[in-house]
Every structure is written in structure tokens, then in C-alpha cells.
């Protein structure tokens, strides 16, 4: 081997040793690329000095560290990766928010004035106002703006009612709505006991299971007027109803699932009950025996229509003896009642003003003349019980009494007449502007 060949190999080994030292200094695994004897890679980067090689190695080390960090962050889906770059490049820049021009007049007026403005807005506009700023959010959620709400004929999504009750609604109409399960979230049910501000609640013909209805009624202890017409009940529902000690009006017309225990709890605890509608509830003899002897003495308007085979003279007399202040009574479609019930009615209820006895065929027509003894008696409904001749004779005998003027009973019903969006005379919808 010639001396020239030996010299070139020694120079190549010497230069290769320098490259190993450079790579070792920057701690990067690029030995293979820079130990190539033909130096193609070096010529591509136009490396002419060791100083330039060090700078190039430093750039490769940064890229390697960035790739390792991105690989590590990709394992965590909740970690937002950030990119490293040179000082002369900017990948992300936060745009400054445009500053509003002009005068903010709302900052110069008090919260009370803003609330007076907000009270004329519908609920959908209030929700939009709550997204403007923190101050508007607090004001738009004020309880004075959410006293009444009409959710009738709507499909209510799960847990929406929980949000609505927390805003302080006291007058709520849910008639003919569909309330989807669950009514309340798990966090709410497992948290500390909380009670709503509801005082007037209309649940007539609502689509809901008895279990969910019991959960809804469990947070209501301040109710004054309640309607659960045409709902399926259970013992838990009745017990939750009975915890409303200030309840004065209760509409249970056409309800199913009523038990003697549930009725007894309502009679014992709701001592301020004034109007009670139990029509067409298919009360059994056990229910009547558990309820009527304990009927609240404050009841003035009572609807017992539709009990064709269970309500007899004995049961009605027990109820009448407990309610001396009876003003309106509906005993229509009670086929077992006789003249004896009528005589007790005239004796124990001297303040009676309105009587419904339609289709009670076992009550003789002559018993209606006994009602003339009552000084305050004004209205009598006897549809399909008297002939035209008997009806004309009765009108001549009692000229001051209006006969067959009211087709339907309004006892404890939340919505009557043309006021279809009001419950018990209270407005539920937003004012029109």
C-alpha cells in the first residue's frame, strides 16, 4: 500500500474522530449520517468548519427534543401540545379584543332599574341577557323575574325542571306536558335536602311515572294549590302531598292508584284544605272508610261525583258531618245515594249554595224542594234526572234558584272558562309588549 493511500486513510479517520466528538457533545444520535466517508451530507449542508457543524448539530438536537415531547404529550388526550420554534418565528398570536366605543349607559344605572327593564322581557330573552356579562347574568337570574312560568304542552328534557326550580318559580303550569326521566340529576338527589318555592302547581294530565312524580313532589312543601288531575299516583305521592300543611286547594280528579293509606295521610296533615276534587277516582270502600271520617273540617267545596257503586248514604253522611261549612257539593253519578242523604245535607250544611246531583237516579225529585229551606242556596244542577214538566214545576217553586246553568263543575280546577293560560286566576305567561 502506498504512502498516499495510508495518509488519506489516516486523515479520514482523524476527521471522522472529530465528528464523533461533535456528536457526543450535542448528545444526539446522528453518528451514522456524519460518519459517511463520501461526505455527501456535509457537502449538502455546505459545512466548511467545525463551528458550523456544531450549530447544525444543535438544531438537530432541538428538533429531536420537540419530537420526543410531542410524542409524550400525544399519550395524554387532555394535554394541549405546544410547538417550539426559533425566536424569529411566531406560530400563535392572541388577537386583542376590540375595545367598545361609546358610553356604557347600563353601568350608570342601578340594578333596580335594570330589573324593572328585564321584567318586561320574555324568558328566552332573559336567557340571552345572562350571556352578556357577569352583572347581567346575576340580574337575569333574580327570583323576581322567575315567579311564574308556563311550561304547558311541552316536552321537558331531563333535569331542565331542576334548573327552573332553582330560579325561584312559585307559579308553574305543566299541564299536558311530557316530563322525561330523570327529573333531577344524581348530584341533586344525593346532595343536601332542598325545597322549592313553588306555591301553585298545575300537573293536570302530565305524562310522568308515579316514581318521578313522587320525586318532584318531594321538594314541594310550600304548596297552596295543587292539581294532579288524571295522574297515576302511589303512596309516596300522597305522602309527599300531605307534607304541604298550607294546602288549601287539591284537584285529584280521575287519578288512579289511590290507596287508603295515602288518603288518610292527606286528611290528617292537610288541615287547611278548602277545596277538594275526588271525582271519578274509583275510590274503594276501604278508601272511603279511611278518608271520610277524617275529612278536614275546613272543606267548603267537595266533588265526589262518579262513585257509582261505592259511595252510599253512610259514607256521605260521615263526610257531611265533618264539614259544616259546606258551600258547594257535587254528588253527580252516585247511584247509591237516596233521600236520606238529602235530608242530612239540608240539616248539617245550612250554608250550602251550589249542589250538583245530576244522574243520581235514586234521589226522588221531591227532595229538591227541601233545598228551599236553605237561605243561601243559589244553584242546582240536575241534568237527566227530571222530566221537562218536573223541571218547570221546580223552577216555579224556587224562582230565586238557577237550575241547570253550569254543565261542568269547577271545584279545585286550575283552569276554567276562557282563561286557558291562568291557574286559579293567576297569570302564568309573560306579558306581551
What role is predicted for each listed range?
Residues 154-159, 178-186, 206-212, 231-237, ...:
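Short, solvent-exposed loop/turn at the beta-strand->alpha-helix junction
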Residues 173-265:
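A generic tandem-repeat structural signature
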Residues 224-312, 316-319:
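Solenoidal tandem-repeat scaffolds enriched in leucines and small polar residues
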Amino acid at each position: 500500500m502506498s504512502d498516499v493511500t495510508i495518509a488519506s486513510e489516516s486523515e479520514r479517520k482523524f476527521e471522522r474522530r472529530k465528528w464523533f466528538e461533535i456528536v457526543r457533545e450535542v448528545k444526539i444520535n446522528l453518528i451514522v449520517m456524519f460518519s459517511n466517508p463520501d461526505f455527501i451530507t456535509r457537502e449538502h449542508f455546505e459545512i466548511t468548519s467545525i463551528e458550523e457543524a456544531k450549530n447544525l448539530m444543535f438544531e438537530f438536537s432541538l428538533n429531536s427534543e420537540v419530537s420526543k415531547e410531542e410524542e409524550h404529550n400525544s399519550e395524554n388526550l387532555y394535554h394541549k401540545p405546544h410547538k417550539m420554534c426559533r425566536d424569529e418565528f411566531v406560530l400563535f398570536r392572541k388577537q386583542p379584543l376590540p375595545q367598545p366605543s361609546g358610553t356604557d349607559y347600563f353601568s350608570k344605572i342601578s340594578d333596580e332599574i335594570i330589573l324593572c327593564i328585564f321584567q318586561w322581557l320574555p324568558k328566552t330573552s332573559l336567557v340571552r341577557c345572562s350571556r352578556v356579562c357577569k352583572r347581567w347574568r346575576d340580574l337575569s337570574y333574580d327570583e323576581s323575574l322567575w315567579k311564574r312560568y308556563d311550561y304547558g304542552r311541552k316536552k321537558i328534557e331531563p333535569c331542565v325542571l331542576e334548573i327552573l326550580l332553582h330560579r325561584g318559580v312559585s307559579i308553574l303550569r305543566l299541564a299536558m306536558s311530557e316530563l322525561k326521566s330523570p327529573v333531577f340529576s344524581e348530584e341533586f338527589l344525593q346532595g343536601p335536602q332542598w325545597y322549592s318555592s313553588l306555591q301553585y302547581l298545575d300537573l293536570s294530565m302530565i305524562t310522568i311515572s308515579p316514581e318521578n312524580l313522587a320525586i318532584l313532589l318531594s321538594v314541594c312543601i310550600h304548596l297552596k294549590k295543587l292539581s294532579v288531575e288524571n295522574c297515576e299516583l302511589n303512596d309516596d305521592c300522597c305522602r309527599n302531598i300531605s307534607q304541604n300543611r298550607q294546602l288549601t286547594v287539591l284537584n285529584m280528579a280521575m287519578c288512579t292508584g289511590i290507596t287508603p293509606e295515602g288518603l288518610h295521610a292527606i286528611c290528617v296533615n292537610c288541615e287547611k284544605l278548602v277545596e277538594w276534587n275526588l271525582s271519578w277516582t274509583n275510590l274503594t270502600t276501604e278508601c272511603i272508610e279511611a278518608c271520610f271520617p277524617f275529612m278536614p273540617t275546613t272543606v267548603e267545596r267537595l266533588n265526589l261525583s262518579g262513585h257509582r257503586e261505592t259511595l252510599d248514604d253512610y259514607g256521605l253522611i260521615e263526610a257531611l258531618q265533618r264539614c259544616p261549612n259546606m258551600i258547594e257539593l257535587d254528588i253527580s253519578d252516585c247511584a247509591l245515594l237516596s233521600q236520606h242523604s238529602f235530608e242530612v245535607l239540608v240539616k248539617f250544611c245550612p250554608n250550602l249554595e251550589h249542589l250538583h246531583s245530576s244522574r243520581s237516579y235514586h234521589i226522588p225529585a221531591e227532595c229538591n224542594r227541601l233545598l228551599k229551606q236553605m237561605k243561601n242556596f243559589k244553584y242546582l244542577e240536575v241534568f237527566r234526572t227530571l222530566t221537562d214538566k218536573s223541571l218547570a214545576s221546580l223552577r216555579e217553586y224556587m224562582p230565586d234558584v238557577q237550575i241547570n246553568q253550569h254543565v261542568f263543575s269547577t271545584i279545585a280546577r286550575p283552569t276554567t272558562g276562557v282563561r286557558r293560560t291562568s291557574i286559579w286566576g293567576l297569570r302564568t305567561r309573560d306579558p306581551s309588549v
